[in-house]
Amino acid sequence: MVHFTAEEKAAITSLWGKMNVEEAGGEALGRLLVVYPWTQRFFDNFGNLSFPSAILGNPKVKAHGKKVLTSFGDAIKNMDNLKTTFAKLSELHCDKLHVDPENFRLLGNVLVIILATHFGKEFTPEVQAAWQKLVSAVAIALGHKYH
Protein backbone atom coordinates (compact mmCIF):
# COMPACT_ATOMS: atom_id res chain seq x y z
CA MET A 1 0.00 0.00 0.00
CA VAL A 2 1.23 3.47 -0.86
CA HIS A 3 1.13 6.14 1.82
CA PHE A 4 0.44 9.72 0.80
CA THR A 5 1.49 12.52 3.12
CA ALA A 6 -0.89 15.35 3.93
CA GLU A 7 1.23 17.61 1.72
CA GLU A 8 1.04 15.20 -1.22
CA LYS A 9 -2.72 14.84 -0.83
CA ALA A 10 -3.09 18.62 -0.71
CA ALA A 11 -0.96 19.08 -3.84
CA ILE A 12 -2.99 16.47 -5.72
CA THR A 13 -6.44 17.65 -4.64
CA SER A 14 -5.61 21.31 -5.20
CA LEU A 15 -4.65 20.73 -8.82
CA TRP A 16 -7.50 18.26 -9.37
CA GLY A 17 -9.99 20.92 -8.29
CA LYS A 18 -8.83 23.10 -11.18
CA MET A 19 -8.80 20.28 -13.74
CA ASN A 20 -11.08 20.28 -16.77
CA VAL A 21 -11.64 16.50 -16.79
CA GLU A 22 -13.30 16.42 -20.20
CA GLU A 23 -10.56 18.37 -21.94
CA ALA A 24 -7.60 16.80 -20.15
CA GLY A 25 -9.03 13.28 -20.39
CA GLY A 26 -9.46 13.46 -24.14
CA GLU A 27 -6.05 15.00 -24.53
CA ALA A 28 -4.39 12.33 -22.34
CA LEU A 29 -5.97 9.37 -24.11
CA GLY A 30 -5.38 10.98 -27.50
CA ARG A 31 -1.72 11.57 -26.70
CA LEU A 32 -1.37 7.97 -25.49
CA LEU A 33 -2.76 6.67 -28.79
CA VAL A 34 -0.48 8.94 -30.84
CA VAL A 35 2.74 8.44 -28.88
CA TYR A 36 2.22 4.71 -28.28
CA PRO A 37 0.36 3.60 -31.42
CA TRP A 38 0.24 -0.06 -30.39
CA THR A 39 -2.33 0.94 -27.74
CA GLN A 40 -4.78 1.69 -30.56
CA ARG A 41 -5.58 -2.02 -30.88
CA PHE A 42 -7.79 -1.76 -27.80
CA PHE A 43 -9.91 0.90 -29.50
CA ASP A 44 -10.65 -0.61 -32.91
CA ASN A 45 -14.32 0.39 -32.59
CA PHE A 46 -13.39 4.09 -32.29
CA GLY A 47 -13.18 4.65 -36.04
CA ASN A 48 -10.33 6.44 -37.78
CA LEU A 49 -7.18 6.44 -35.65
CA SER A 50 -4.80 6.54 -38.60
CA PHE A 51 -3.13 9.89 -37.94
CA PRO A 52 -2.72 12.30 -35.00
CA SER A 53 -5.34 14.87 -36.00
CA ALA A 54 -7.92 12.11 -36.51
CA ILE A 55 -7.14 10.70 -33.06
CA LEU A 56 -7.11 14.03 -31.25
CA GLY A 57 -10.36 15.12 -32.92
CA ASN A 58 -12.14 11.79 -32.44
CA PRO A 59 -15.26 12.20 -30.24
CA LYS A 60 -15.01 8.59 -29.00
CA VAL A 61 -11.42 9.17 -27.88
CA LYS A 62 -12.50 12.34 -26.07
CA ALA A 63 -15.47 10.62 -24.41
CA HIS A 64 -13.45 7.63 -23.25
CA GLY A 65 -10.63 9.91 -22.11
CA LYS A 66 -13.13 11.77 -19.94
CA LYS A 67 -14.30 8.44 -18.51
CA VAL A 68 -10.71 7.40 -17.78
CA LEU A 69 -9.84 10.67 -16.12
CA THR A 70 -13.06 10.61 -14.12
CA SER A 71 -11.81 7.34 -12.63
CA PHE A 72 -8.75 9.26 -11.44
CA GLY A 73 -11.23 11.29 -9.41
CA ASP A 74 -12.10 8.05 -7.64
CA ALA A 75 -8.39 7.54 -6.98
CA ILE A 76 -8.11 10.99 -5.45
CA LYS A 77 -11.09 10.35 -3.18
CA ASN A 78 -9.64 6.98 -2.15
CA MET A 79 -5.87 7.49 -2.15
CA ASP A 80 -5.51 5.25 0.89
CA ASN A 81 -7.43 2.37 -0.69
CA LEU A 82 -6.53 2.25 -4.38
CA LYS A 83 -6.42 -1.55 -4.67
CA THR A 84 -10.06 -1.88 -3.62
CA THR A 85 -11.11 1.21 -5.59
CA PHE A 86 -9.78 -0.25 -8.84
CA ALA A 87 -10.47 -3.96 -8.22
CA LYS A 88 -13.34 -4.18 -10.73
CA LEU A 89 -11.53 -2.14 -13.38
CA SER A 90 -8.45 -4.30 -12.90
CA GLU A 91 -10.52 -7.42 -13.41
CA LEU A 92 -12.21 -5.97 -16.52
CA HIS A 93 -8.95 -4.89 -18.13
CA CYS A 94 -7.24 -8.20 -17.30
CA ASP A 95 -9.91 -10.82 -17.91
CA LYS A 96 -12.10 -9.29 -20.60
CA LEU A 97 -10.05 -6.65 -22.41
CA HIS A 98 -6.59 -8.26 -22.00
CA VAL A 99 -4.86 -4.90 -21.73
CA ASP A 100 -1.13 -5.07 -21.10
CA PRO A 101 -0.70 -3.55 -17.61
CA GLU A 102 2.30 -1.56 -18.86
CA ASN A 103 -0.24 0.63 -20.68
CA PHE A 104 -1.54 1.89 -17.32
CA ARG A 105 1.93 3.18 -16.48
CA LEU A 106 2.22 4.82 -19.90
CA LEU A 107 -1.14 6.54 -19.49
CA GLY A 108 -0.14 7.79 -16.05
CA ASN A 109 3.04 9.29 -17.45
CA VAL A 110 1.08 10.93 -20.26
CA LEU A 111 -1.30 12.39 -17.68
CA VAL A 112 1.65 13.93 -15.82
CA ILE A 113 2.75 15.57 -19.10
CA ILE A 114 -0.78 16.91 -19.65
CA LEU A 115 -0.82 18.35 -16.14
CA ALA A 116 2.53 20.04 -16.74
CA THR A 117 1.32 21.62 -19.97
CA HIS A 118 -1.97 22.77 -18.45
CA PHE A 119 -0.63 24.14 -15.17
CA GLY A 120 2.85 25.40 -16.09
CA LYS A 121 4.67 27.02 -13.17
CA GLU A 122 2.00 25.81 -10.76
CA PHE A 123 3.15 22.26 -11.57
CA THR A 124 6.22 22.44 -9.34
CA PRO A 125 8.62 19.53 -8.83
CA GLU A 126 6.86 18.79 -5.52
CA VAL A 127 3.45 18.69 -7.20
CA GLN A 128 4.88 16.54 -9.97
CA ALA A 129 6.34 14.11 -7.42
CA ALA A 130 2.95 13.78 -5.71
CA TRP A 131 1.15 13.19 -9.01
CA GLN A 132 3.81 10.76 -10.23
CA LYS A 133 3.35 8.81 -7.01
CA LEU A 134 -0.43 8.75 -7.55
CA VAL A 135 -0.35 7.67 -11.20
CA SER A 136 2.19 4.96 -10.35
CA ALA A 137 0.00 3.70 -7.50
CA VAL A 138 -3.07 3.71 -9.77
CA ALA A 139 -1.15 1.75 -12.42
CA ILE A 140 -0.17 -0.83 -9.80
CA ALA A 141 -3.76 -1.05 -8.54
CA LEU A 142 -5.09 -1.49 -12.08
CA GLY A 143 -2.51 -4.19 -12.73
CA HIS A 144 -3.25 -6.02 -9.48
CA LYS A 145 -5.48 -8.67 -11.09
CA TYR A 146 -2.61 -9.67 -13.37
CA HIS A 147 -0.52 -10.94 -10.45
From Swiss-Prot:
> Where are the membrane-spanning stretches?
none
Please tell me where heme b binds in this chain.
Answer: H64, H93
Q: Which Pfam families match?
A: Globin
Annotated Gene Ontology cellular components are:
blood microparticle; haptoglobin-hemoglobin complex; hemoglobin complex
The keyword Isomerase is annotated on this UniProt entry: no
Q: What does this protein do?
A: The epsilon chain is a beta-type chain of early mammalian embryonic hemoglobin.
Would you tell me the protein name for this molecule?
Answer: Hemoglobin subunit epsilon
- In which organism is this protein found? Saguinus midas (Golden-handed tamarin)
Gene that this sequence comes from: HBE1
